[in-house]
């Protein structure tokens, strides 16, 4: 099915991508904020962010603010295209099921 993306379709990854998509015009989302938005645990969020980064859908940056580590994530151009394609495909499936 064109547009359907197995990487994004996993429920937590879909929530992560939705949050990154919504924040795309602003600064990257900090790990703690993304964790709160998605309801993920530290380990789950880290693992799924790594999978999205490996697919080229998310860019992860790590730095320090003072002495505290900071991890942030942003959607990439490829991630934006994949997310839009996937959500368009889901929308079409839902509309077909309603008809």
Question: At which residue positions do the language-model features occur?
Answer:
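Amphipathic alpha-helical dimerization/coiled-coil segments
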Residues: 1-3, 21-22, 82-99
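Histidine-centered active-site/metal-ligand motif
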Residues: 9, 48, 86
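Structural motif
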Residues: 11-14, 55, 70
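Canonical helix-turn-helix DNA-binding module
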Residues: 32-62, 67-68
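Basic, amphipathic "hinge/linker" alpha-helix immediately C-terminal to the N-terminal HTH DNA-binding motif
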Residues: 65-86
């Amino acid at each position: 099915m064109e547009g359907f993306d197995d990487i994004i379709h996993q429920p937590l990854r879909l929530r992560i991508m939705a949050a990154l998509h919504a924040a795309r015009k602003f600064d990257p989302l900090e790990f703690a904020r993304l964790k709160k938005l998605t309801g993920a645990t530290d380990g789950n969020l880290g693992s799924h962010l790594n999978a999205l980064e490996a697919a080229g859908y998310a860019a992860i940056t790590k730095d320090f603010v003072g002495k505290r580590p900071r991890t942030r994530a942003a959607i990439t151009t490829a991630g934006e295209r994949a997310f839009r394609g996937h959500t368009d495909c889901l929308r079409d499936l839902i509309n077909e099921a309603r008809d």
